[in-house]
Amino acid sequence: NHQTYFADVVAMFHVFNASLSGRGNSIKNVTYLWNPKLNIYYVAAKETMHAGLLPKIMAYAGAITVERTWRSCGKDVTEKREVNPDDTENIRIALDDGWVITFPQGTTKSFKPVRKGTAHIIKQYRPIVVPIVIDGFRRSFDKKGLRMKKKGIKQSFVIKKPLEIDYDNDTIEEIVEKVEFAIEQHPSFLKVVPAEEIEN
C-alpha cells in the first residue's frame, strides 16, 4: 500500500519505465523518460486530487478519480455511501488501455484492511494482478510525499509474481486475503517473533 500521497506514484512511473527500457535496480540517468510508457493510470480519491495545485496537475497524468464510500475529508464516515458506477467503468476503460495502479487499502496507514471494492474489480474485470511491496517512503517523506523528512533511507519496490486467482470460484473474501498476503499487509505479518525462535 502507498505510504505517501504522491512520492510513491511518481517513483512507480520511474521504476516501470526504467525496467521497460532494460534497467535493473536503477533509475539513474533518466534517458528512459524520452520514450515513456504513457498508458499507466492510477486510482486516487477525488477529494485528494482536488486539494491543491499539484494534485490537480497530477490528475492530468493518468488519475482515475473515485469517490471513497467510507471516508470523507480525512475522516471515516458512519454511513457508507453507494459506489458510483462511473468510477468502476472508468477503471475498466483504463484496464482495457493499459496498466492500472491501485492502493487496495485506500490509506497511507499500514495494516488497514484491503477494501472489498478492489476484490470486486478484480473479480469483475479479471486483470492480471501484480503485487508490489513498498518500503521506505513513510520514513523518508511527509504524508503528502512532497517534503523529505530524513535522508539516507532506502526506498524500495519489490515487484512480485502475478497472483493466482480463480476468477470464477474465488470469493471476494478469498481475493482480499490473497491481496493482503501478497502486499504483506495481512494481520499475521504483525505478529512478533519471540527472541528464542530467532536464536534457534
Regions found by a protein language model. Name each.
Residues 1-78:
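Catalytic core of membrane glycerolipid acyltransferases/transacylases, capturing the structured
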Residues 5, 37-56, 91-95, 99-102, ...:
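A short, hydrophobic secondary-structure junction motif
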Residues 9, 88, 115-119:
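Conserved glycosyltransferase catalytic-site signature
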Residues 64-111:
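Internal catalytic-core helix/loop-beta-alpha segment
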Residues 88, 92, 156, 172-180:
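Short, amphipathic alpha-helical "lid/cap" segments that border enzyme active or binding sites
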Residues 96-101, 106-174:
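A cross-family acyltransferase "interaction/gating" segment
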Residues 118, 175-186:
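Short amphipathic C-terminal alpha-helix that caps PH/PH-like domains
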Residues 193-200:
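Short, highly charged C-terminal tails/helix-capping segments
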